[in-house]
Amino acid sequence: MVQESIISSFRGKLENDPSKSTSLATVETLLEVLDRSRATTVAEFQNELNQVVAALEKTDYSSTSIRSAADLFTRFTSLAPAALLDQEDFSQVLDLYRQRARSFIKNVRGSRAKISKCARLFFTHHMNILTHSYSKVVLETILDAHKSGYHLHVWVTESQPDASGKLVFEELKKNGVPTTLVLDSCVGYVMERIQAVLVGAEGVMETGGIINKIGTVNVCIIAKSRHVPVYVCAETIKFVREFPLNQADIPQEFKYRTSVIERNNLELEHPDVDYTAPEFLTLIITDVGAMKPEAVGEELIKMYI
């Protein structure tokens, strides 16, 4: 019953606030678990978290984002001095965990603003930018650049099969950003007039590649053939300890929603995401700065030390 209320709370966070990322909703939900916890040992608390994370991954939200956010939340929150862990009163340990969790979430909430500020370094006036799919951090980055006085023209792919690009198109138009909506199959045609590709990521892999909305790899391959830089805007909470080398290496739970997997007929289904290898990416723009794709593995090591 408690777990059902937690999952309901998670869904509510995303449904009531369209601007909230799956990653942020995940860590806020795990904080609720921590606040309610009456665990008396580290193992008992970890078991509580693991059960909730497993339930979150069975929702139809991005399993990639849930996995990475939960892993980093657990890692950051559960660091505690050995002397404190040896005490009989585990409530003091939980209090420290709660304090660290709130600090972690505060940093996550400020991630997009840091990315937007960093990304300005790569914009020029009268720049043509191409973006694919609906990424909240990419949208905020473009709007921030527009408000800062950059004159940009944004080309947005439809991003089928759910046409999520149309949401980006409408949002940019509403905010006065010159925007053109193009067919996914038109990317090769328009690329010759594009100065930069800007995409988000559901997950940044240990390889330095990204998992993102289906069609992203097509856009990035075409961009490289035209010598157009590809910038990935992604919070470090989306860094994942996975090492795919090709499409076949993507975990099944990343490729398909749970409801699709449960139908047990994946041969008839299209994957939601694809993998773009690091050689097709120029920079990963994050809340800790811009980095080359090959630096992601080192950054992950720092996070988990």
UniProtKB/Swiss-Prot annotation:
Pfam families: IF-2B. Acts as a component of the translation initiation factor 2B (eIF2B) complex, which catalyzes the exchange of GDP for GTP on eukaryotic initiation factor 2 (eIF2) gamma subunit. Its guanine nucleotide exchange factor activity is repressed when bound to eIF2 complex phosphorylated on the alpha subunit, thereby limiting the amount of methionyl-initiator methionine tRNA available to the ribosome and consequently global translation is repressed. Keywords: Cytoplasm, Initiation factor, Protein biosynthesis. Signal peptide: none annotated. This is Translation initiation factor eIF2B subunit alpha. Belongs to the eIF-2B alpha/beta/delta subunits family. The lineage of its organism: Eukaryota, Metazoa, Ecdysozoa, Nematoda, Chromadorea. It comes from Caenorhabditis elegans. One of its GO terms (cellular component) is cytosol. It comes from the Eukaryota. GO terms for molecular function: guanyl-nucleotide exchange factor activity; identical protein binding; translation initiation factor activity. Component of the translation initiation factor 2B (eIF2B) complex which is a heterodecamer of two sets of five different subunits: alpha, beta, gamma, delta and epsilon. Subunits alpha, beta and delta comprise a regulatory subcomplex and subunits epsilon and gamma comprise a catalytic subcomplex. Within the complex, the hexameric regulatory complex resides at the center, with the two heterodimeric catalytic subcomplexes bound on opposite sides. It is found in: Cytoplasm, Cytosol. GO terms for biological process: cytoplasmic translational initiation; translational initiation. The keyword DNA repair does not apply. SUPFAM superfamilies: NagB/RpiA/CoA transferase-like. The keyword Metal-binding does not apply. InterPro entries: eIF2B_alpha/beta/delta, elF-2B_alpha_N, IF-2B-related, IF_2B-like_C, NagB/RpiA_transferase-like. Its main location: cytoplasm.
